[in-house]
Amino acid sequence: MYVAVKGGEKAIRAAHALQEQKRRGDGRLPELSVEQIGDQLSLAVDRVMTEGGIADRELAALALKQASGDNVEAIFLLRAYRTTLPRLAVSEPINTAEMRLERRISAVYKDIPGGQLLGPTYDYTHRLLDFTLLANGEAPSVQQANGEAEPTPHVFSLLTQQGLAKTEEDRGTPPDDITRTPPVYPCSRSSRLQQLMRGDEGYLLALAYSTQRGYGRNHPFAGEIRSGYVQVEIVPEELGFSVNIGELLLTECEMVNGFVAPQEEPPHFTRGYGLTFGMSERKAMAMALVDRALQAPDYDEEIAGPAQDEEFVLAHADNVEAAGFVSHLKLPHYVGFQAELALLKRLQRENERG
């Protein structure tokens, strides 16, 4: 048994060396730097930060490089590193209404206070391969407009002021922290949003799509999608007042959903909310759609689709947990298989005897 274990260790070390060689690729080619990944593969970095739970572009780019571009493996690496970090402070709530905008669009109103800003996007492109990139084509220069920034209140706040939507209420209870306390179903809204933010983008996208195909009552409009930089502040105990410690690039999505007519309230629109690091717009939209679907019990709506089942959605959203459980099937299961094999052969013998 000892010889078998030592042999396994040698095989594992050799496998890791081979993987490292494969990750590096052809040595005649220049190595891809972490800075290049962070700057030129920014959307992949945004996803790893969002689902890995650390807003650090350098660490996310490093994880992507180490994982050979495997997003889920990079997210796993970032989550593992996160467990080693001390918690030095808790930030004040960020104010996305004061975001320094990179992009802002609304599908419900053409003219909104502060205007719409198309910003960087793949929308409206023809999805044709750009072969000039094979020749290291340079990006076109962009002229920056110098204009005075106008206030950009949330579109949903305009609806609430007109009595068309219900204002979100802060009940004063501290938000849950799913990194310290395991979720318990049914979840609080804060716990649900945290799990959705860390959830797998593809999984949430599929569930969001299902709500549009009839598996759950959900008729949404993109009330507002905004991306930009927000200030992060903390209140040090020794000072007693807030101090700006930096800024974060975030994407926020508020979906205007079908109206409800409660008995004790006037009819009003409902909302779904999504928030991600970076420019992860598709993830923010999917998150907002699923968030609204999970509010079905709050509005006494019939559970008509998987996206409305809170425990089903949230318990299977984490790609690190999912990948870990599926991957464990690669480990030796010799004893378990031999037991089933013996049982199958016994049943076959009994069947032959009639």
Residue ranges: model-predicted function:
Residues Q143-G354:
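Acidic, serine/proline-rich low-complexity intrinsically disordered regions
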Residues M1-S227, F241-V243, R349-G354:
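Short, amphipathic alpha-helical interaction segments embedded in low-complexity terminal/linker regions
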